[in-house]
Amino acid sequence: MTNNITPIHEYKKYWAECFGTAPFLPTSRKEMDALGWDSCDIIIVTGDAYVDHPSFGMAIIGRLLEAQGFRVGIIAQPEWQNKNAFMQLGKPNLFFGITAGNMDSMINRYTADKKLRHDDAYTPNNEGGKRPDRATLVYSQRCREAYKEVPIVLGGIEASLRRVAHYDYWSDKVRRSVLFDAKADILLFGNAERALVEVAHRIANGEDISTMTNIRGTAVNLPAAPEGYTVIDSSRIEKPRKEAFVPKNPYEVETQCETKKDEPVAQPITIRPSRHDAATTAVRLPSFEKLRNDRILYAHASRVLHLETNPYSGRALLQSHGDRELWVNQAPIPLTTEEMDFVFGLPYARVPHPMYGKAKIPAYDMIKTSVNIMRGCFGGCSFCSITEHEGRIIQNRSKESIINEIEEIRDKVPGFTGTISDLGGPTANMYRLGCKDPKAEANCRRPSCVFPGICNKLNTDHKHTIDLYREARKVEGVKKVMVASGVRYDLAIESPEYVKELVTHHVGGYLKIAPEHTEKGPLDLMMKPGMGTYDRFKEMFEKYSAEAGKKQYLIPYFISAHPGTEDEDMLNLALWLKKNNFECDQVQNFYPSPMCNATSMYYSETNPLKRVKYKQREDIPVAKGERQRRLHKALLRYHDPANWPLIREALINMGKKHLIGDKPTCLVPAEDIDAQTPAQRRKSGRHGANRFATKHTKNQPGFGGHLNKRAEGGSKDGKPSGNRNGSGKVQGGQRPASNGQRPSGNGANRPAGSKPQGQGRPQGQGKPAGQRKPKRR
């Protein structure tokens, strides 16, 4: 299937290879002069600080192009108000490569509630405001102002997930493909190493970029559809059937009588294009102009797009934008293990550029001792965009390459303590897993290999991962190898030996997993397994932890306000959390990021996982209003007194008043009118909130730390001031003991570095691939 693909490490090198390898890719004319360069062949503009590490997109792309012989410069987080910063390295000989960074710039700058963030993990000292909104567009405009004739190549996750007309959460409307708004020459989607190397060499050979219309993994702006393709029209949901056709004049149709019977007329044979002719077939999506006014049609377009993501059988896409055509080529062929080893084996310095001095870059600090062992994810979660960006087929590194990187970390990273912080990827336990049938894999259009059940053609044997873990632990100078990436527990329970290996050697007290919800309705729309699977994994986890003599805890992640979630679903989740003694410290509402299936659900209020029709469709409830989204988030933090008024009001409206009170079965305590000030009784507190103080009995678990200060003799900072009078009151700051309560806070029987279950920081997740950890791009 890939015989005609040139491996990325076998291209003839560009003449500038004679300059050798730079210690860091230059960011100024002074650095260029030190390298003996008179100009750059390619300049990469990025919204992140420049860290020469394989978890950062600009470093991988820059080092890859350098390995092809090109002179590559970096303009990191430029001042975007004028063109001057974009001219600091001079005019590139070949093209500008533009990326917003490892994250979509809008997700980076705004919360799920559209509030401006004041920090940025990809910026020195965690400083916010160093990149513009829609950075890809702004950087493209400034590059065009600086050097009008230089080609512009878009890449990175922001461009990748906005390659077609898409719903934009921040403006609450459907926007054009970013390729049109940026006025760029070509867009590369996915990780894009293969497409980028081909584009660079073809431009270097003198080919005009406007002629590069058939490169896999690219999107281009054309005046008309390319010739030689059979176009299948999917721009409408329901087409009139041929038998429903009625001629304008009924007398034009000659009726037959019994005495006059014509011989059957030979009908022309029509040959339907086979899916195996994907190389010469394209699918027309609804136009941008139609999508921005028809939310049901948008759900249909999203469904069609997701069905065409298989790199072997997926077809090119065509979408009209006014009088122009957006042409999206087939998905890129996944990198082989040899190519993955080549990319991750490039000469990275593994530290931030020296120009940042001693400034801390939080994203780098998080991943400086982590190793990415694979790419891609076949989980297909609706709220996640990893599959749309990296693909469903897992791209693996060899064990030797991974061990070599661990040794590099040991030798190069300043202050290495002997701990590898993570050995994983988008999912911790998909290394060398995949379809056992190559023919089935080449033609499969399932959105997930594990939902609604694990495909019988999927290899779930974790032996390669187990062997890798054991080899990593043997590396000299390495004391501990952790697994911090999320574990897909429905896969893990298929291999008890893997769970035992993981729990015994690679969990540092807590293990992150993502059930995301407890109710079947939301879980089905998320394409996540039911809670029975979670319970089976929890049982195995606790069993092997006990056998290893360790007290370890699961940290579950949950999403609030996901499409398809009703108030009662969130209430049931909150009751489950309380029953299991979990208190979520960090919670996030669902974040509609471009191209996700769940984003299509959010906008269209329709299920795109099933066939979409105007009359016969599955409508789903969506929490869009600010108050309802606040309620869903508040229910995940049922233990926070600030959320109690909102939860009480909702429980009363839902007819669930019996869940308000001091009984162990209640979710929140009743309001204590006697403890309120007159202003609080008038509901005239700060920001119009009903600020309150509440007393609790010993029978209400989980609220001991929120006792009223004046009533209980607490100190000014709200902490207990010693022994308290009265039955069940806290002695010395400890929580009262009661059935079903979290373990006591004295830690007497707790191993170092661990907490009782429920005291971790589970957080609801809804961000695009590549955006939970900085290693994604």
From Swiss-Prot:
Binds 1 [4Fe-4S] cluster. The cluster is coordinated with 3 cysteines and an exchangeable S-adenosyl-L-methionine. The keyword 4Fe-4S applies. Keywords: 4Fe-4S, Iron, Iron-sulfur, Metal-binding, S-adenosyl-L-methionine. SUPFAM superfamilies: Radical SAM enzymes. Residues 680-698 have a biased composition (Basic residues). It comes from the Bacteria. This is UPF0313 protein VP1980. It comes from Vibrio parahaemolyticus serotype O3:K6 (strain RIMD 2210633).
